[in-house]
UniProtKB/Swiss-Prot annotation:
The protein's name in its UniProt record: Probable septum site-determining protein MinC
Entry function: Cell division inhibitor that blocks the formation of polar Z ring septums. Rapidly oscillates between the poles of the cell to destabilize FtsZ filaments that have formed before they mature into polar Z rings. Prevents FtsZ polymerization.
Family annotation (InterPro entries): CAP/MinC_C, MinC, MinC_C_sf, MinC_N, Septum_form_inhib_MinC_C
Family indicated by similarity: Belongs to the MinC family.
NCBIfam families assigned to the protein according to its UniProt record, in alphabetical order: minC (TIGR01222), PRK13992.1 (NF010598)
Domain of life the protein comes from: Bacteria
Keywords attached to this entry: Cell cycle, Cell division, Septation
Organism of provenance: Thermotoga petrophila (strain ATCC BAA-488 / DSM 13995 / JCM 10881 / RKU-1)
Length: 210
């Protein structure tokens, strides 16, 4: 299910397609234990998951789990093994994982991915081609144009907010929309009536939780 491979990209944790995330996390822990003292705390690895898009919402939990085990994920690779040879990877794209706290005081550029298990606050812009994967809510004090996936741990109570919400994609828990907010109007995206709605700050009406 999981294994570490030495490749041209360096050391890669390869996770095959799976059905149960808890089984994957347990398998990662077991594999690292089997490897004894191979890793030092803070070692950086790459991560590749088969059927990346299917499992994208699990990435914050996987990255957080690896961090708790002392490993930092430097980049996420999208691709496949070549000719069944697991040590030869065909990489279609790669995104940099920002090892950061929940408060980011800069722009997030194209090709960068921010992964955090809780809320993420950005004092800057989220450019096209950038991505945020957050366990909680995401608030951008700037223009948001990239992909933002929120509520991956906390569920549909999470929100996505920005001073200018022009995202390519918003995901909150299991809900996805490609809609945008009104240009240059501070807006909040939240789940209401089993779908994501985007409303101006001054007109937002949240659905009451039971």
């Amino acid at each position: 299910m999981v294994d570490f491979k030495m490749t041209k990209e360096g050391l890669v944790l390869l996770i095959r397609d799976y059905q149960n995330l808890e089984e994957v996390l347990n398998a990662i822990s077991a594999r690292i234990t089997q490897m004894g003292g191979f890793f030092a705390k803070g070692d950086r690895i790459s991560l590749m998951i088969e059927n990346h898009n299917k499992h994208s919402q699990d990435i914050p939990k996987i990255v957080s789990h690896l961090r708790n085990l002392g490993l930092e994920v430097s980049q996420i690779l999208v691709g496949s093994t070549v000719g069944g040879k697991e040590n030869d990877l065909k990489v279609e794209s790669r995104t940099t994982v920002e090892s950061t706290g929940k408060v980011i005081k800069r722009n997030i550029r194209s090709g960068q991915t921010v992964v955090h298990s809780g809320d993420v606050i950005v004092f800057g812009n989220v450019n096209k081609g950038a991505e945020i994967l957050a366990g909680g809510s995401v608030v951008v004090f700037g223009k948001a144009q990239g992909n933002i996936r929120a509520g991956l741990n906390e569920g549909e109570q999470a929100v996505v907010a920005a001073l200018d919400l022009q995202t390519s994609l918003i995901q909150i828990a299991g809900f996805i929309t490609h809609s945008k907010g009104e240009e240059n109007v501070p807006s909040i995206a939240h789940v209401k009536g089993n779908r994501i709605v985007i409303e101006p700050f001054d007109k937002v009406s949240f659905e009451r939780s039971e």
